[in-house]
A protein has these predicted regions:
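Helix-enriched interaction subdomains in cytosolic or periplasmic regions
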Residues: 11-51
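Gly/His-enriched, cation/cofactor- and phosphate-binding structural elements
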Residues: 38-69, 97-99, 281-435
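Anionic-ligand anchoring segments at beta-strand to alpha-helix junctions in alpha/beta enzyme folds, i.e.
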Residues: 68-131
Length: 435
């Protein structure tokens, strides 16, 4: 019997509980010999979730065996999503899946293309390339498909396994109900880790698939941990550190990882950066840069520019605004260390900024431990942009078109500053130290 055809209880949650919590003794026994008793005791919470995932997948082994599986990442795949997918692919293969496909729409960063090429990861188009009637899984992002960072993917109503450290379970539950999702059979959303790859690596350790994926697969998972925690500097947990160390312990894996970290950027990236710094608005500790038009293959430069702006001394909120083939995109990075002891305040400010300026099309994540670091973004599809401000098809061609797109980004930048200034007037305590 296919898992996707098991009906959920009427009126029950969409995100199905993954089963009863395993006892502490059981968790200690399973992980004590793999990770050490002291480490297991100190990290019993997240390791309990790993064991729940293991037990849940074993429980559905008969349904997996002989069945095709789709693993969806964000539309634009990143190392954490791809590393997680490689590990989950091996786990599902161990459980007898007939075919497992990793579905990613594009690779926006040169490092991602380098990863796919060197680790020989085979990717499929999320719509045409999916297995019909396959079990649907998601890693490093959450249902429903067709929203947020999976915007171009056609939606489905049933999901088998989801692992994501970004989203809040309540938000995902609400979004799934709003978009007609019936059930997520094994839901691990809001994982307390710095990278989804760390969670999947620990799960892969229980399934004993590390040797199966070889040095390239271990390096892919290691790179996922490395990049999503900014070289293990921002937001890593003890599990991230331990999994990265164990994954890269052998020389072969370490050599592959070195090759993955050594990549080159196309000249266009530096042009975008120059434009951004030339068109930057600064108000106190807030910086907003207009980037202009960015090709789909270079989309990751938007987030990278926001991260670079945050490194400027005295900056608490850094934002980059660009136009892509998807729409008008905004990337935000923020750090609460300049706000005194009230670190949580930066989260409230970014939440207000994104939801007020881009209602219904934004999302963000943040570190839950002070000092809070925030990453956020929003994308207004072209249909909405045309209704509100401009027509892309009439303005993209030639220098005049490029200037029109840049001016559009400047107008968004000015609007974001205005939103913060309005917030300062309405709730001055929240913006103290920012403007």
């Amino acid at each position: 019997v296919s898992v996707t055809r098991v009906r959920a209880r009427k009126g029950g949650p969409v995100l199905q509980p993954p089963g009863r919590l395993p006892g502490l003794r059981r968790v200690s026994t399973r992980f004590g010999r793999l990770l050490g008793k002291r480490f297991t005791h100190k990290n019993i919470g997240v390791l309990t979730e790993v064991l729940r995932a293991y037990v849940g997948l074993r429980r559905f082994e008969k349904s997996i065996r002989g069945h095709g599986v789709n693993i969806f990442t964000q539309w634009v795949g990143d190392p954490d999503a791809l590393g997680s997918a490689v590990m989950l692919q091996a786990i599902l293969g161990e459980l007898g899946a007939s075919e497992v496909r990793i579905l990613t729409g594009s690779l926006g960063h040169p490092q991602n293309r380098n990863l796919v090429e060197k680790c020989r990861i085979r990717l499929f188009e999320p719509n045409a390339g999916r297995i019909p009637d396959g079990l649907n899984c998601m890693v490093d992002t959450s249902p429903p498909l067709g929203t947020a960072n999976t915007g171009r993917a056609e939606p489905v109503t049933d999901y088998f396994f989801v692992a994501d450290h970004h989203a809040d379970p309540e938000d995902v539950e609400r979004a799934c109900r709003d978009h007609g999702v019936k059930r997520v059979q094994l839901a691990f959303v809001g994982l307390p880790v710095g990278s989804t790859s760390a969670f999947l690596a620990a799960l892969g350790l229980l399934f004993d698939v590390w040797e199966t994926i070889g040095p390239a697969g271990r390096a892919a998972a290691g790179l996922g941990i490395y990049t999503d925690t900014s070289a293990l500097l921002h937001g890593p947990t003890a599990l991230d550190f331990r999994m990265f160390e164990k994954l890269t312990r052998d020389d072969d894996t370490s050599d592959v990882l070195d090759e993955l970290r050594d990549y080159r950027l196309p000249p266009e990236w530096f042009i975008h950066r120059a434009v951004a710094f030339q068109n930057m608005l600064t108000r106190g500790a807030v910086r907003v840069a207009a980037v202009g038009y960015v090709r789909d293959a270079e989309r990751d430069v938007i987030a990278e520019i926001a991260s670079e702006l945050l490194r400027i001394e005295g900056t608490s909120i850094a934002t980059a605004v660009a136009v892509t083939d998807l729409g008008t995109e905004v990337s935000i990075r923020a750090d609460s260390r300049l706000l005194g002891r009230d670190h949580q305040r930066i989260v409230d400010v970014i939440d207000h900024l994104l939801e007020y300026a881009f209602p219904g099309v934004s999302g963000f994540k943040y570190e839950r431990r002070p000092p809070h670091r925030v990453e956020g973004g929003a994308c207004i599809p072209h249909e909405q942009s045309e209704e509100l401000m401009w027509r892309l098809g009439a303005t993209r061609g030639g220098p005049d078109g490029q200037e029109a797109l840049l001016e559009h980004c400047r107008s968004i930048a000015r609007a974001l500053i205005a939103v913060l200034e309005d917030l300062k007037f309405a709730r001055p305590a929240e913006t103290a130290g920012l403007l």
